[in-house]
């Protein structure tokens, strides 16, 4: 059911209500609930249920009428929202008001009986008092709920049979576009590697074992003038991160990237950068740019994408590389479990080939991950090399994602990820936070986030105390997205 008023019309109704008094039920004077009912009646012709204001979100069926939001640290109210304060207001009955303005720091409302002057004559029916609808600013609080009405559309929908309807035309859906790669050819100068005498026969895809800061540009800065002694430790043809490709060697040159004569002489090595330090989303983007560059090169050389032209480092020597790609796309971690089995190797190669073929055909593929991996969040199964440990014994890693609480309140801590630290507040069911850090400490997995300048630490599941990557975790107390 859509409201009888548009949002703009209801805002005007709220503005005209300032200075007036409302007693919608005819009892106990001009209560805050009466003013909420007056607005609800203007919108839907209905009255709300509940003994006190705090009952409104739970005693009413808002299906089709409104959406109920529970306050979270980064929730932003909107004009026209009904805001419900919990039982710590109104002598246990709560409080309710209508939002007219809002920022992330405060709300400005129209409200009645905030000062308790809505019923002062002692007469139960109808009752009277001096307090009128007033405009006032409040801080967000916990718990607090916001009820957002389904306002009438600003422009009423027209019947499909109306003669004023324009003829429908087929509109082409916008097609996704490939990232425009920034290819920087700046061949290493410290040593002139030998020529192979022909185009490469295949591409070897690597994971670089680099930190978050190990971007293509960082490799360029560190290797372009490196001496022979450094290049002998390994040099691939290209390094890829974001939309940047640093071409370190000419296509005609032999590379030193597989520790194998055939791989070095006939293969073109490409490093997917930041494989040890980047979050999954960043690494998957680096992969996609790598696939796009592979497609460009294969087309240039007149080669198809198949199992002969797309190779893995671990085909030429005993190595876990490409380790991060293996975890994401096969669910098998060669760093902790040993060499990648042949069936997993073929699974990974075929994924690479499918992605590259799509780029060769002018399509934009979608990155997919194995159900056995934890690509949506390292919180579930962290990559051991991404963890660090501080002087307090806390294991921690960078990660950016959203945690949404399940059906039980969680005590949030300040100062640090310890159960003995000061209590921040109660993180309510359905609330969410956008965190930037994951920690293992004091028998729990914690996420860290900042709200209004304060750093908070929220436990989201249990931890058995074992150091990563051998930790055993309990069930997640909500969802990660």
From Swiss-Prot:
Domain annotation Peptidase C51: ranges: 7-148
Identification of the protein by name: Endolysin LysH5
Active site, UniProt feature: 32 (for endopeptidase activity), 95 (for endopeptidase activity), 111 (for endopeptidase activity)
Protein family per UniProt: Belongs to the N-acetylmuramoyl-L-alanine amidase 2 family.
N-acetylmuramoyl-L-alanine amidase domain location: 198-323
One Pfam family, short name: Amidase_2
Residue stretches spanning the membrane: none
Function: Endolysin that degrades host peptidoglycans and participates in the sequential events which lead to the programmed host cell lysis releasing the mature viral particles. Exhibits lytic activity against Staphylococcus aureus isolated from human and bovine samples, as well as Staphylococcus epidermidis isolated from human samples, although with lower lytic activity. No lytic activity detected against several lactic acid bacteria and strains belonging to Bacillus, Streptococcus, Clostridium, Listeria, and Enterococcus.
First-level EC class: hydrolase
Biased composition (Polar residues): 155-166
InterPro entries: Amidase/PGRP_sf, Amidase_domain, CHAP_dom, Papain-like_cys_pep_sf, SH3-like_bac-type
Entry EC number(s): 3.4.22.-, 3.5.1.28
Cofactor note: Zn(2+) is required for amidase activity.
Influence of temperature on activity: Optimum temperature is 37 degrees Celsius.
Catalysed transformations (reactions): Hydrolyzes the link between N-acetylmuramoyl residues and L-amino acid residues in certain cell-wall glycopeptides
Occurrences of domain SH3b (ranges): 398-466
Domain description: Contains a cysteine-histidine dependent amido-hydrolase/peptidase domain (peptidase C51/CHAP domain) at the N-terminus, a central amidase domain and a SH3b cell wall-binding domain at the C-terminus. The CHAP domain is present at the N-terminus and is associated with the endopeptidase activity. The SH3b domain increases the CHAP domain activity.
GO molecular function: metal ion binding; N-acetylmuramoyl-L-alanine amidase activity; peptidase activity
């Amino acid at each position: 059911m859509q409201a009888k008023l548009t949002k703009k019309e209801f805002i005007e109704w709220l503005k005209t209500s300032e200075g007036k008094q409302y007693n919608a039920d005819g009892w106990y004077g001009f209560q805050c609930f009466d003013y909420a009912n007056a607005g609800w009646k203007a919108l839907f012709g209905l009255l709300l249920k509940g003994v006190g204001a705090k009952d409104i979100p739970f005693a009413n069926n808002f299906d089709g009428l409104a959406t109920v939001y529970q306050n979270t640290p980064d929730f932003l109210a909107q004009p026209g929202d009904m805001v419900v304060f919990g039982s710590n207001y109104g002598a246990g009955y709560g409080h309710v008001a209508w939002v007219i303005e809002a920022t992330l720091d405060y709300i400005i409302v129209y409200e009645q009986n905030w000062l308790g002057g809505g019923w002062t004559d002692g007469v139960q029916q109808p009752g009277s008092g001096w307090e009128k609808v007033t405009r006032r600013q409040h801080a967000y609080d916990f718990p607090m709920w916001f009820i957002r009405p389904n306002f009438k559309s600003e422009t009423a929908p027209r019947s499909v049979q109306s003669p004023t309807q324009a003829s429908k035309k087929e509109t082409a859906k916008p097609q996704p576009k490939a990232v425009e790669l920034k290819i920087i050819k700046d061949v290493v100068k410290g040593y002139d590697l030998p020529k192979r005498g022909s185009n490469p026969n295949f591409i070897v895809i690597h994971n670089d074992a680099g930190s978050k800061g190990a971007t293509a540009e960082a490799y360029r800065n560190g290797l372009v003038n490196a001496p022979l002694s450094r290049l002998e430790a390994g040099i691939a043809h290209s390094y890829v991160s974001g939309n940047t490709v640093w071409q370190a060697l000419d296509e005609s040159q032999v590379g030193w990237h597989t520790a194998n004569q055939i791989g070095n002489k006939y293969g073109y090595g490409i490093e997917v950068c930041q494989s040890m330090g980047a979050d999954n989303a960043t690494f998957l983007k680096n992969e996609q740019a790598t696939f796009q560059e592979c497609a460009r090169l294969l087309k240039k050389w007149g080669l198809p994408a198949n199992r002969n032209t797309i190779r893995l480092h671990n085909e030429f020597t005993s190595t876990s590389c490409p380790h991060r790609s293996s975890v994401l796309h096969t669910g098998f971690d060669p760093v902790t479990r040993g060499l990648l089995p042949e069936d997993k190797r073929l699974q990974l190669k075929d994924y690479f080939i499918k992605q590259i073929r799509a780029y060769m055909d002018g399509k934009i593929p979608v990155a997919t991950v194995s159900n056995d991996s934890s690509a949506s969040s390292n919180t579930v199964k962290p990559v051991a090399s991404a963890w660090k440990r501080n002087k307090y014994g806390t294991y921690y890693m960078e990660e950016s994602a959203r945690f949404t609480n399940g059906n039980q309140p969680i005590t949030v801590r300040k100062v640090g990820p310890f159960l003995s630290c000061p209590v921040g507040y109660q993180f309510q069911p359905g609330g969410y936070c956008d965190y930037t850090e994951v920690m293992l400490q004091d028998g729990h997995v914690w996420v860290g986030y900042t709200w209004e300048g304060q750093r908070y630490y929220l436990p989201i599941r249990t931890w058995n105390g074992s150091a990563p990557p051998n930790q055993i975790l309990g069930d997640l107390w909500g969802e990660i997205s």
